[in-house]
């Protein structure tokens, strides 16, 4: 919680966790073909390079404060001095950043033109791990907010809460789709797009939390200028993913060798429901920004909108 209370330390935590994920991929993927493992690590390194560039040039946590040393520094907000908050931010970022690994495997498969189901078998454990960390982070935050009687209770549909829910929903759809693609060889294009979408939403969540463009009860560590850098990285990630898919996607074969009453059909329905839920949350979260951009006034989308659609 102390690292997340200042933007620069939060971004340092982000790149440190990505370095950890990259090291684990390098270690546990030793049995993969060398060219595939190299491509995955190159893509992770490219993401790391972009985040490090933003850290160094816009948000360096190593800037000296001397000679203006404060006589008595401010303590951490008492509400944040809680055991649950020791693990809540790191677990969230483990989930956020972990989405980069399935994205890297997806992009590596597109890069190599290897669009069979093999890459999904390599990617699925990492997607499950990222989903597990993100689930734990959300649960810890909800548990803390519930007994702390703050932040609107265990779930308030706050924009920052939504920023963690959207990649969680996308990753939930992704792990189901990865399993079916691995075992049945279907939904290959859909699985690729979900891999790109899940990581894009994790970057969008980072942007929303740290840019200050939204009004939130999580009002600490906002920086509109540096938020634009995250937005630029988001654009690069989405653009690179869509361009790679456009160049290589034509090689995919459409396979629909399953009946109406089958597990594959149920998975399609499941993914559609999850995707619609994600888009509903995305619309409600971004609508105030869109309205303000078009001079439609200050609009607040709160629990009544989400409760009406979900409950």
Please place each PLM-identified region on the residue numbering:
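Transmembrane alpha-helix boundary signature
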Residues: 1, 24-37, 52-67, 106, ...
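Short, small-residue-biased leader/transition segments that mark boundaries at the very start
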Residues: 2-6
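Membrane-interface loop-to-helix entry segments
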Residues: 8-13, 84-100, 158-167
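Central hydrophobic cores of alpha-helical transmembrane segments in multi-pass inner-membrane proteins
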Residues: 14-30, 101-110, 168-178
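Membrane-interfacial loop-to-helix junctions in multi-pass inner-membrane proteins
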Residues: 24-48, 111-132, 157, 180-196, ...
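Juxtamembrane interface elements at the cytosolic ends of transmembrane helices
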Residues: 62-70, 94-113, 171-176, 208-216, ...
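Interfacial helix-loop-helix junctions of multi-pass membrane proteins
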Residues: 141-162, 212-214, 219
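Contiguous transmembrane helix-bundle modules in multi-pass membrane proteins
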Residues: 159-166, 216-311
